[in-house]
Amino acid sequence: MNPIVKSFEYGQHTVTLETGVIARQADAAVLASMGDTTVLVTVVGKKEAEAGRDFFPLTVNYQEKTYAAGKIPGGFFKREGRPSEDETLIARLIDRPIRPLFPNGFTNEVQVIITVVSVDPQIEPDIISMIGTSAALAISGIPFSGPLGAARVGYINGEYVLNPTVTQLESSQLNLVVAGTESAVLMVESEAQALPEEVMLGSVVYGHDQQQVVIKAIAEFKAEAGKPAWNWTAPVANEALVAQVKELAEDGLAQAYQIQVKQDRYAQVAVVKAAAKEALLAANPDVDLREVDGLLGSLEKKVVRGRIIRGEPRIDGREPDMVRALSVLAGVLPRTHGSALFTRGETQALVTCTLGTERDAQKIDSIMGERTNRFMLHYNFPPYSVGETGMVGSPKRREIGHGKLAWRGINAVMPTAEEFPYSVRVVSEITESNGSSSMASVCGTSLALMDAGVPIKTSVAGIAMGLVKEGDNFVVLSDILGDEDHLGDMDFKVAGTRDGVTALQMDIKIEGITKEIMEIALQQAYGARVHILNVMDQAIGSHRDDISDHAPRITTIKINPEKIRDVIGKGGAVIRALTEETGTTIELEDDGTVKIASSNGDATREAIRRIEEITSEVEVGRIYNGKVIRIVDFGAFVNILPGKDGLVHISQISDERVANVSDHLELNQEVTVKVMEVDRQGRVRLSIKEAQTKEAAAE
């Protein structure tokens, strides 16, 4: 074994790339390290493409092994299972920038597997996974227009920070990941604390500049360790067939794309394509219909893009900077804690908000440690939203990714646990879709949270921008349709408030996207965002003054931390009885904070009364109503507070001489007693006759 190693400094860390020792039967394998965080990246590609395949089957699998953090998995089987949400999101983060770097027409199956084998709790594994993937693809010989660089950018005390640690991110106003080639930014994913557009743009430029050291190092690594390039050539276009398809379908497609209603347009496009195929089959029964489908798709793209570049109206008749018609409704469902229906053109989201207690929060145990997520946002994309049939079940990668993007857009305005002691779950059901459903989810979530009475700092809206670029000519599009996303060169999603950006996601399919284009897109997005916020604020401009009658109300009280064990009781018996008998949910914290949750005010008050009884101290000289719980020869034990008993000596039962305690008292008898003394050991001395004397004096 002859290892080839490349090391370089990158921000605060040393990055090492190594190949030639592990997984030598893969087309490429790289052990990539950043500090103590290490990933094994393998790449395997099939040498032959499946006949007739018209798509590129790229699979990216990212897996975190618990042994990397010195842990044993939980659960019955004690081994890793299905991918977690974090693993799915990082797999998408790696997939998005590498996919456009494979050549058009390349349909060989390629699988990339990233395995986290060691983790430093201060260095997240996503950036080194992207770097390792870029290096493995670069040396594999598979056609790939890399290398690719990746960087995380923070913003702390007004300065950009390259690859901040986990601790630094806690005080950062920005968490941005940018990936790109030497000359172009390809992907951006970020979460921010309502930062100005110029700060966001600056962070993208900064991250791209800093990652040049990665790109250079991988190029040097490839020169030393690279395998011979595959003998692959792009399929040659059948120019005669291209001309025939153009003649048969171009005019029909141009007319079909004048139809503004999506379903009607799709129906007419299908008619035009079917007629073209029928004519081609009549002329040549051996024509390859898959090839024809590809050519029709390319022609469709050319027709739509040409109209936009020429300054003609968009597919639905809008100008480039126009937002589709908006409909905003809050409080649309009677029993949910909060709800909203947000409609933008043919995209619609029904969003609900549910409030719960702290124990309803999501508990995540990952290789980076345990954490609790009080705010959850789930995005569902059922097939009926686009007029199709399909499988319904667990969320797909796309749904998880869109939900996380919407979560990032909203998280910056969420209240702290001290301000609002509830767990919050939002669900966005996409009921119609024609582009930008994730940004519709952001808008709907903001509305539903306000309807639920969640004190978010301000309204948040999201908008998806697009781009069509031909040579030096380009047009930036606001509020793109699904077709414009599919046929365009950029998908640029921005969520934010009136004051700044809270989330930015960008996927670019071509090179040549300049800082000027990104700046125009951000400014155009700001105008669209403010327009949407104005409409949203007309429906509900601030959060409701109170939460729903159907939501649990959380009341917080403080007790002496030393009394927590009394509230819990032996084996949890006391708190279990409290919750069952009052119908409340009770949560205790180590500092003595007690949170009582119930939708019934009387139940809450009863729980508070009983907790105060349990935790109150016995006061010398005070009169208590108690119950006889045990009789002995020398007196009786009386319970005066939950868990607090005292002794009434035989001499303190009556002013008369008492020969036999049982002649005066019986078990479970209610008596009035006065506390005479509490000794150093906490023993309580009670008196019935002193209590009677005090009561008589009071009368």
From Swiss-Prot:
InterPro entries: ExoRNase_PH_dom1, ExoRNase_PH_dom2, ExoRNase_PH_dom2_sf, KH_dom, KH_dom_type_1, KH_dom_type_1_sf, NA-bd_OB-fold, PNPase
Location in or out of the cell: Cytoplasm
GO CC annotation terms, alphabetical: cytosol
EC number: 2.7.7.8
Catalysed reactions, semicolon-separated: RNA(n+1) + phosphate = RNA(n) + a ribonucleoside 5'-diphosphate
Superkingdom of the source species: Bacteria
Annotated S-S bridges: none
Cofactor(s) this protein cannot do without: Mg(2+)
Residues holding Mg(2+): D485, D491
Record domain KH: where: 552-611
Record carries keyword Metal-binding: yes
Keywords annotated in UniProt: Cytoplasm, Magnesium, Metal-binding, Nucleotidyltransferase, RNA-binding, Transferase
Gene Ontology BP, a term: mRNA catabolic process
Molecular functions (GO terms): 3'-5'-RNA exonuclease activity; magnesium ion binding; polyribonucleotide nucleotidyltransferase activity; RNA binding
Pfam families found in the cross-reference section: KH_1, PNPase, RNase_PH, RNase_PH_C, S1
Residue ranges of domain S1 motif in the record: 621-689
Protein family according to the UniProt entry: Belongs to the polyribonucleotide nucleotidyltransferase family.
Subunit structure: Component of the RNA degradosome, which is a multiprotein complex involved in RNA processing and mRNA degradation.
Known function: Involved in mRNA degradation. Catalyzes the phosphorolysis of single-stranded polyribonucleotides processively in the 3'- to 5'-direction.
Name recorded for this polypeptide: Polyribonucleotide nucleotidyltransferase
